[in-house]
Amino acid sequence: MMMNAFFPAMALMVLVGCSTPSPVQKAQRVRVDPLRSLNMEALCKDQAAKRYNTGEQKIDVTAFEQFQGSYEMRGYTFRKEQFVCSFDADGHFLHLSMR
């Protein structure tokens, strides 16, 4: 009876020891083309200026972040009203969120 449980347990230990370690996964970072980011900034400023009924020169974009297949630009107006512009992976404008 003891032998019946011993062999499967031993075989399992041998097989576990033979497995190869899984490769280390790293986060993917895509470098954004400067021209694309400038176009995205201009579009974000334009959309924010329309939403807040002001001129583009009174809009400041302060941060540019990449997320899972999308981009976000954070900014604020001269009245310190914050907003976030969202773009898809290709740089197309999705929406503007007021914060």
From Swiss-Prot:
Query: What Pfam family is a match, any one?
Result: YsaB
Q: How does it sit in the membrane?
A: Lipid-anchor
Point out the signal peptide segment: 1-17
Q: Which residues form a coiled coil?
A: none
Q: Does the keyword Membrane apply?
A: yes
Q: Does the keyword Lipoprotein apply?
A: yes
Q: What is this protein called?
A: Uncharacterized lipoprotein YsaB
Q: Which organism is it from?
A: Shigella flexneri
